[in-house]
Amino acid sequence: MHCPFCRHPDSRVVDSRTTDDGTSIRRRRQCPDCSRRFTTVETCSLMVVKRSGVTEPFSRTKVINGVRKACQGRPVTEDALAQLGQRVEEAVRATGSAELTTHDVGLAILGPLQELDLVAYLRFASVYRAFDSLEDFEAAIAELRETTGHPGEEDDTGAGSQENDRGPTGAGQVPEPAGAAD
């Protein structure tokens, strides 16, 4: 490893530690020429093959940014997004493969996102699975109801029998235009 200060072609490892998340090793190094110390971080490279065939390094930041779009307007914190990003990275690294497809990464996102927020899950799944009809959404919602055990709409208040602002059937009501009742 070249010294970043004097460009000497060698350095000595003084200390090595695994990072808190266990995905990389932090090494303190010392240059034998100028005696200055510097830190390096060593990680195992994980490559993602995109649909176009282009290969690029896996990026937790890209995962978080993609999920952030699906969570827009939802009560999801930045901390929760960071944890989701870490879970996704751990899942794709656990496969043991050095190369993954974008499809594999998308599948790794869906599980943790479903646990985080069902609406964000549907938004992400609609893009990831390329929903192009209402039936695709209905099938995804039916699948969610089966897997999560929600027979009807999700209700945070716990009062499942109460009417909501959508009326007694739960269907959205279309407001009448002004002057239509005249």
UniProtKB/Swiss-Prot annotation:
Region span, Disordered = 144-182
Q: What cofactor does this one take? A: Zn(2+)
Zinc finger (unnamed) stretch: 3-34
Q: Which keywords are on file for this protein?
A: ATP-binding, DNA-binding, Metal-binding, Nucleotide-binding, Repressor, Transcription, Transcription regulation, Zinc, Zinc-finger
Note accompanying the cofactor annotation: Binds 1 zinc ion.
Record-linked HAMAP family: NrdR
Q: Which domain of life is it from?
A: Bacteria
Q: Report the leader peptide range.
A: none
About its domains, the entry says: The ATP-cone domain may function to recruit ATP/dATP to elicit a conformational change in NrdR that is necessary for binding.
- The entry's protein name is Transcriptional repressor NrdR
**Family membership:** Belongs to the NrdR family.
The task this protein performs is described as: Negatively regulates transcription of nrdRJ (class II RNR genes) and nrdABS operon (class I RNR genes) by binding to NrdR-boxes which are proximal to or overlap with the promoter regions of class II and class Ia RNR operons, respectively.
Q: What's the gene?
A: nrdR
Q: What happens when the gene is disrupted?
A: Cells up-regulate expression of nrdRJ and nrdABS transcription. A mutant in which amino acids 1 to 41 are deleted is unable to bind zinc and also unable to bind the nrdABS and nrdRJ promoters. A mutant in which amino acids 151 to 182 are deleted is able to bind to both promoters to the same extent as the wild-type. Functional zinc-finger and ATP-cone domain are required for binding to the promoter regions of both sets of RNR genes.
Supply the source organism for this entry: Streptomyces coelicolor (strain ATCC BAA-471 / A3(2) / M145)
Which GO terms label this protein's molecular function in UniProt? ATP binding; double-stranded DNA binding; zinc ion binding
As a miscellaneous remark, the entry gives: Seems to be allosterically activated by ATP/dATP.
Its GO biological process terms?
negative regulation of DNA-templated transcription
Q: Which InterPro entries match?
A: ATP-cone_dom, NrdR-like_N, RNR_NrdR-like
Q: Can you give the residue ranges of the ATP-cone domain?
A: 46-136
